[in-house]
Amino acid sequence: MRFIHTADIHLGATPESKMDWAVHRGDEMWGTFERLIKKVKEDEIELLIIAGDLFHRQPLLRELKEVDYLFSTIPDTKVVLCAGNHDAIKKGSFYRNFEWNKNVYFLDSKTVDCVPIDDLGVDVYGLSYYKNEITEPLYDDIQIKNPYRINILVAHGGDDKHIPINKRKI
């Protein structure tokens, strides 16, 4: 299986916003994401994992539609993503009711959930942030459903304020 794992893309960010080139830098981030999708298509990647913070803040509806359109250009690739601490699923978030393309699996649970991707023989585990800081070690008690499949954890965080990870318990 060929897959790409990425995180912290931060679409919508304007780094160093007081600089003259800040708007262009934000556009470059979108361009980089578009090149990633093109690379997925060219290399016939079977699974694309985005482990949080696709956006730097709550995504606008038009931004979700644009991302979903890009995902629609790679219909043979399964896409699994979750919300991170920057784009956490808060009240009023467009993430809550967004209908993704059929090749996209959005891990929208507050607790670890499993997405089985049968045609790849893969189970993908993960959760989404619903607030910017989570101090509970939510990944510690994962129960693998089928040890004979490929099991992948999509985890965002790892420090004391962002779902601490104890490697011995995973």
Where is each model-derived feature located?
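N-terminal active-site segment of His-dependent metallophosphoesterases
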Residues: 1-66
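His/Asp/Glu-rich metal-coordinating catalytic cores
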Residues: 47, 57-170
